[in-house]
């Protein structure tokens, strides 16, 4: 179930509107679980753990079409703050 204290994110996938609540713990858990040869399962779990319960069945329809990494990528991009980081040498 989605962490109610996180950032609310709405994704439109095809004609479906899905609602997610992404918190820092879910974001970090997904990144920490990813390896060079294991990206799909953490992406799937991240999406399923952050989606609103009412949208879970619809999300499963899209995840079953191989979109786990795409959906997780959009959620992660939207969750992160938009900042410019520069390095001074």
Where are these regions (language model features)?
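Short, surface-exposed, charged amphipathic helix/loop patches that serve as local interaction elements
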Residues: 2-6, 14-16, 21-89
